[in-house]
């Protein structure tokens, strides 16, 4: 998995943007980053323009590609040959150059102009992640991938991945009744669940044996993947722009079951 992305100006080694996907304790420290930049300065002279190559420096596994004097670096914690990682880094490179080629040519030195690109990085990486690790052979890999992922990465990314998966799995439904039936069927692929409602504007989903937070003790609501999955599934099924969904009970917090409440207004 990608841990961090660095976008660096070649020659000056100026860091234009650093984007981390992990919780703070897993981020690369200053000394390691300095060593990484030094290694890159020697490596890029041998790098074919547009190609993606990898190397290891100390404990870091690094993917690197360069184009138009901009270096794109991905730090990974597993197989650097992963197709998902290479495609993500390539897409980040292409989108960055597409959006900022004019600004770079006429750059005033203001790094803050690149800050808004973080949202595109998230969209690129986690859309690909969902395709490769969750949507493929669904639901075979859901539980293992999510439980491994949630220990190291920020919860907002789990919700994003869940939503992308829900959107990919859903099909348009003609009625609220058919939605209830389909979402119950979909969730039953990896969890016992109960779907109920008092009217067509609200939906309650109870999961008494939640596989996402099983064995976890936390003061926080821990099922962000399911929260995102349900949100994406409902929005796609009913062609809604957005809905309000919230986990109101969680086994990780000591509740008897996990509960999600969706407001479709």
Feature map (PLM): residue ranges:
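Acidic, low-complexity cytosolic segments
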Residues: 1-4, 10-155, 177, 181, ...
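Short N-terminal helix-loop-first-beta-strand/juxtamembrane motif that initiates sensory/input modules
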Residues: 1-11, 189-193, 205
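Short beta-strand
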Residues: 54-56, 65, 195-198, 248-251
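A short, glycine/Asx- and small/polar-enriched loop/turn
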Residues: 66-69, 201, 253-258
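Secondary-structure transition/turn motif
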Residues: 76-78, 206-212, 263-265
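Amphipathic interaction/junction segments at domain boundaries or subunit interfaces
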Residues: 146-225, 235-238, 242, 249
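C-terminal edge-of-domain segments
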Residues: 248-265
């Amino acid at each position: 998995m990608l841990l961090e992305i660095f976008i660096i100006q070649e020659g000056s080694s100026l860091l234009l943007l650093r984007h981390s996907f992990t919780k703070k304790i897993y981020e690369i420290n200053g000394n390691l980053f300095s060593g990484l930049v030094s290694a890159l300065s020697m490596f890029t002279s041998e790098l074919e323009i547009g190609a993606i190559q990898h190397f290891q420096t100390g404990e870091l596994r690094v993917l690197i590609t360069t184009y138009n004097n901009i270096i794109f670096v991905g730090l990974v914690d597993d197989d650097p040959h992963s197709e998902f990682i290479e495609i993500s880094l390539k897409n980040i490179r292409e989108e960055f150059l597409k959006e900022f080629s004019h600004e770079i040519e006429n750059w005033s030195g203001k790094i803050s102009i690149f800050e808004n690109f973080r949202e595109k990085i998230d969209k690129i990486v986690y859309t690909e992640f969902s395709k490769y690790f969750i949507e493929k052979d669904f639901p075979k890999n859901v539980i293992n991938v999510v439980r491994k992922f949630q220990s190291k990465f920020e919860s907002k990314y789990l919700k994003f991945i869940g939503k992308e998966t829900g959107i990919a799995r859903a099909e348009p439904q003609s009625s609220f009744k058919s939605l209830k039936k389909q979402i119950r069927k979909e969730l039953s692929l990896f969890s016992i669940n109960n779907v109920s409602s008092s009217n067509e504007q609200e939906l309650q989903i109870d999961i008494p044996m939640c596989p996402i937070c099983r064995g976890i003790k936390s003061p926080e609501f821990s099922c962000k993947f399911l929260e995102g999955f349900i949100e994406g599934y409902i929005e796609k099924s009913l062609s809604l722009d957005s809905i309000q969904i919230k986990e109101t009970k969680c086994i990780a917090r000591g509740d008897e079951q996990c509960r999600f409440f969706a407001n479709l207004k």
